[in-house]
């Protein structure tokens, strides 16, 4: 289970995984996330991104070898397809959903590790770009850093590096008072 690995272990393993398997990775940066979050919930965003990644990967691989698509279930299959709206889901007949899929199938564990590695790399990129040592999670250090960014850059600055609907934002606002 990839959840039992440290970030350092994941960052060491992922380059090897990427050499061995085809994959597609889509990143939704905080600023765009905050924009989309105004009209779509998290599961809807995830469904749309999953579907796009699946369609792009399908174009890259030998379709004759594809036996199934397994999605780490983050919402019910009926909601997943409802969230897609008018987007096509060409692999629906062979798409399966599994809760905690990373514990049951190596492909989902690999995808989970690639996603975590991308998240960590994204934090590094945003840290360099905006000049703050960005942190993840929900703790006092994160709240204090968000408050510092808010004081120096305003809400527009925080919007570029944080998901504004998280509780950390209100805590950061409270700390600026």
Segments (PLM) and residue ranges:
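RNase H-like, Mg2+-dependent phosphodiesterase core
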Residues: 1-177
């Amino acid at each position: 289970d990839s959840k039992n690995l440290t970030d350092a272990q994941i960052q060491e393993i992922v380059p090897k995984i990427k050499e061995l398997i085809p994959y597609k990775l889509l990143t939704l940066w905080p600023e765009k996330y905050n924009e989309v979050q105004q009209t779509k919930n998290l599961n809807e965003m995830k469904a749309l991104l999953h579907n796009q990644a699946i369609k792009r990967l399908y174009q890259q691989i030998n379709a004759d070898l594809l036996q199934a698509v397994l999605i780490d279930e983050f919402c019910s299959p009926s909601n997943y397809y409802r969230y897609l709206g008018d987007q096509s889901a060409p692999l629906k007949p062979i798409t399966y959903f599994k809760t905690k899929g990373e514990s049951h199938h190596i492909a989902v564990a690999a995808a989970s590790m690639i996603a975590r590695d991308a998240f960590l790399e994204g934090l590094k990129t945003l840290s360099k770009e905006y000049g703050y040592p960005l942190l993840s999670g929900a703790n006092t250090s994160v709240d204090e850093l968000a408050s510092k960014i808010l004081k120096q850059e305003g809400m527009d600055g925080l919007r570029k590096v944080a998901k504004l609907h998280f509780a950390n934002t209100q805590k950061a606002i409270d700390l600026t008072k």
